[in-house]
Amino acid sequence: MSKITEKIAKLLALAESPYEEEAKAALLQARRLMAEHKLMPEDIEPQENKKVVQECVGVTCTKLSSPWTVYLSTLIAAHYCCRPYRSSVHGSKVSEIGFIGMEDDFKLCKLAFLYAYDCVASRCRQIRTQKGYPAKTLREMCNSYGWGFCRGLSAAFQKQEAEHQEWGLVMVVPQAVEDAVSKMKRSSYKISPQSSINRQYAAMGYADGQEFDMRRRLEPSA
C-alpha cells in the first residue's frame, strides 16, 4: 500500500492549476485508484498490522468565515474510509479539522482534503481582490463558492458510485476506526449553507462538478 500511496500523492501533485476542475479530477482519480487496488487482494496489507491515526491537518474554520470547510471534510472522509472531527478550545469559535482512519487511508484522506481545500482557498483569494464590494459581500461570494464546490464534488462522487457500484463493498470505514470514533466526545455542528447565497458563485462550482469528466484530464503514470 505504500507504493499506492506514493502513486496517488504524485497524481495529486500533477495538477498545477488551482481551479476546481483540476481538484475534482485529482480527487476522483485518486479515489478510483484506491478502490481498484483494494479490490486486488495481493495489494492489501492485513489491517490488524496497521494502526488507527487520529490527527488534525492544520486547517481551521469558523461558522462565519468558512462554514463549508466542515462539509468538505465530511464529504471527503466518507469517500476515503475515514471519519472527520473538529478540535477546538472551549469557548473559541475557531475549530481545526481532523480525521480518524487507518494509516494508509488517513494519508490519502489528508492529501485529498488539503488539495481540495487549497483549491477553494485559492479561488477565494481571487474573489477577494475584486474592487467595489464590501467585506460582507465578498465573504458571501467566497462561502457561496465553497458550498458550490462541495456540492459539485458530491455530484461527481455520486456519479462515480453509480458507475462502480461494486466499490461499495470495499470503500467502507473499518470497524477499528468506528470504535475509535465512538470513544470521542461528540459535539453538534450545523453545516447548513447560510441564508444569503450568491447564486452566481454557488452555481459556478456546482456546474463545474456536474459537467466534469473525471477521466478526461488526469491519468496515472505506469
Name each model-derived stretch.
Residues 1-54:
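Long alpha-helical, hydrophobic tracts
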Residues 39-222:
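Extended, helix-rich structural scaffolds rather than catalytic motifs
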